[in-house]
Design a protein with these regions (language model features):
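Conserved N-terminal helical subregion
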Residues: 63-172, 178-182
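Conserved FAD-binding catalytic core of PHBH/FMO-like flavoproteins
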Residues: 165-239
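FAD/FMN-dependent oxidoreductases across multiple families
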Residues: 132, 229-305
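A short, Lys/Arg-enriched amphipathic alpha-helix followed by its capping loop at the start of a domain
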Residues: 23-32, 64
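C-terminal helical "tail/cap" subdomain of flavin- and related membrane-associated enzymes
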Residues: 307-371
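Glycine-rich FAD pyrophosphate-binding loop
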Residues: 12, 28-51
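Redox-cofactor binding/interface segments in oxidoreductases and associated redox assembly factors
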Residues: 14, 161-162, 279
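Beta1/beta-strand and adjacent pyrophosphate-binding region of the FAD-binding site
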Residues: 3-19
Length: 371
């Protein structure tokens, strides 16, 4: 086992998705010493871990990028760009089209683009995992990291879990914490649709969540989120039913799956232990329970925590309860915003209400296609 000699970082960040990469960038720019551990490789074409995701950047996430003065390079954008969603209830066969303003993108390249903005002053371990961590008698966090084909020990004054739904930081700090979760299953197919599309599917016989299909760079991404029990069987039935609506889903090129959280009450959000460990993004439970959109909350929670840590002066243990309270207060608006999303759920996921909304045509677009 190797050890970073005589180095105690101000912050150790686990996970460099949108939340972790944003936090690492902001802290390093403001002069804090940062070490980060990420499962992804640094080269977009070298394989390795990729976050399963439909790859649509919602308006809230676009605003988060805009507020931070960031833009999207052409290499991140996917073809085509879509301006409406075809919404299908697989049980009733009712369809509507709604206008939407998502950016179609390559999620993996987006994540790596955010990582590339982290200043070189930060120490970043790519293609690496945290195997364990503890706090020593001086209040310093000790992380056991597997990186560069060996075990390393890393030391930091604060620890931030930005490692998503299956966060090792959250699981170890709060082993009894329970939050509603689902399995998202997604497959990629050769896109044989006659027209590019973004589609959204509902079928309350299989899930109280939703499914999606997105044309992306010559492929069709098709997926859905299910309660974890029998998710594979539910996905196959879901896919079969979608095929009846003209979708070509016979020969998947690859299959992905991941855990996804779905908060339903304030206690589902866990911000940290009050003693120098913090959680941001989906690791903290910050993901929309209606749309499963999490990128905006990831970047926004990271921005809040960056302000708190960088403005703290000395990161001493006696200050940690105060910093935790500041994070709780400043993130309250974010958490309340997430809880208001629950109010949308009956109109999206309760079959009778959804059928009434779709039948009424409220907010639906009239689509005329000339062949």
């Amino acid at each position: 086992m190797s050890e970073i000699p005589e180095k105690i970082f101000d912050a150790a960040i686990v996970g460099l998705g949108p939340s972790g990469a944003t936090l690492a960038r902001l802290l390093a720019v403001r002069g804090l010493s940062v070490v980060a551990v990420d499962r992804k490789k640094s080269d977009p074409d070298s394989g390795g871990f990729q976050k399963p995701c439909g790859g649509l950047l919602a308006e809230d996430a676009q605003r988060s990028l805009s507020r931070q003065g960031l833009s999207l390079p052409k290499s991140v954008l996917a073809d085509p760009q879509l301006f409406s969603v075809r919404t299908i209830d697989l049980r009733t066969a009712r369809e509507r089209t709604y206008r939407r303003f998502y950016i179609n993108m390559n999620r993996h390249r987006f994540d790596l683009g955010l990582k590339s903005l982290i200043p070189v002053s930060a120490t970043v371990f790519h293609d690496a995992t945290v195997r364990n961590f503890s706090r020593n008698e001086n209040g310093i966090f000790e992380l056991s990291v597997y990186a560069e084909h060996e075990e390393k020990r890393v030391f930091a004054r604060t620890l931030v879990g930005a490692d998503g739904a299956s966060s090792i930081i959250r699981r170890k700090l709060f082993p009894e914490h329970k939050i509603r979760d689902y399995t998202a299953v997604q497959q990629w197919f050769s896109d044989e649709q006659t027209r590019p599309l973004y589609a959204c599917f509902f079928d309350d016989r299989l899930t109280d969540c939703y499914g999606w299909a997105v044309s992306k760079d010559g492929e069709l991404v098709f997926g859905a989120a299910f309660p974890r029990e029998d998710s594979s069987k539910a996905y196959e039935l879901f896919r079969e039913r979608a095929e009846r609506f003209g979708f070509s889903l016979k020969k998947p090129v690859r299959t992905e799956a991941c855990r996804v959280l779905r908060p339903e009450k304030m206690s589902d959000f866990v911000l940290g232990d009050g003693n120098g460990a913090f959680l941001i993004g989906e690791a903290a439970g910050m993901i929309s329970p209606s749309s499963l959109e999490g990128m905006s909350y990831a970047m926004d929670s990271a921005e809040i925590l960056a302000d708190i840590l960088s403005g703290a002066g000395t990161l001493a243990p006696e200050k940690f309860p105060e910093l935790a309270e500041h994070y709780r207060k400043r993130s309250r608006k974010l958490r309340l915003k997430l809880l208001t999303k629950i109010l949308k759920n009956p109109f999206m996921y309760q079959p009778t209400l959804r059928n009434l909304v779709m039948r009424s045509g409220i907010a639906a677009e009239r689509v005329k296609i000339d062949n």
